[in-house]
Every structure is written in C-alpha cells, then in structure tokens.
C-alpha cells in the first residue's frame, strides 16, 4: 500500500510542476508526505501528511517543518 501512495505522490508532483507553488512550508506538503510515508509506512505516514496539509493555509506562519 505504501508503494502505491508513494507512486501517487510522485505522479502528483510531476503534474504540479505546471502550476504555481502554493505551499508555505519547507519541504513542500507533497515532499513531506512522500518522506513521511517512506519513513513511517502507509498508515502513520498518511496521518502525518493529513495533519500537515491541515496546517498549510494562508494564515499559517510556514517555514521549516521536517518530518519528525
């Protein structure tokens, strides 16, 4: 399951190159998701990614937010 999620993230990243960047964090949310799933597996990695996406909004401070 993790490999499928990682492939979907890579597919998203491939197509998102053609849109303006909107993530205020470093690494970007998609890269964070890829790292989290690769490190923690499908379930915990997806949970961390969803929490990160919820924090990524125009009123957030942004900045460095590495995978724990």
Swiss-Prot record:
UniProt keyword annotation of Cell membrane present: yes
Localization (cell): Cell membrane
Cysteine-cysteine disulfides: none
Pfam families: YidD
Membrane topology: Peripheral membrane protein
Similarity section: Belongs to the UPF0161 family.
Protein name listed in UniProt: Putative membrane protein insertion efficiency factor
Phylogenetic classification of the source organism: Bacteria, Bacillati, Chloroflexota, Chloroflexia, Herpetosiphonales
């Amino acid at each position: 399951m993790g490999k499928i999620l990682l492939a979907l993230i890579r597919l998203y990243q491939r197509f998102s190159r053609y849109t303006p960047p909107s993530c205020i964090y470093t690494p970007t949310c998609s890269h964070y998701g890829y790292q989290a799933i690769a490190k923690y597996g499908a379930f915990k990695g997806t949970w961390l990614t969803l929490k990160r996406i919820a924090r990524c909004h125009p009123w957030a401070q942004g900045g460095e937010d590495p995978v724990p």
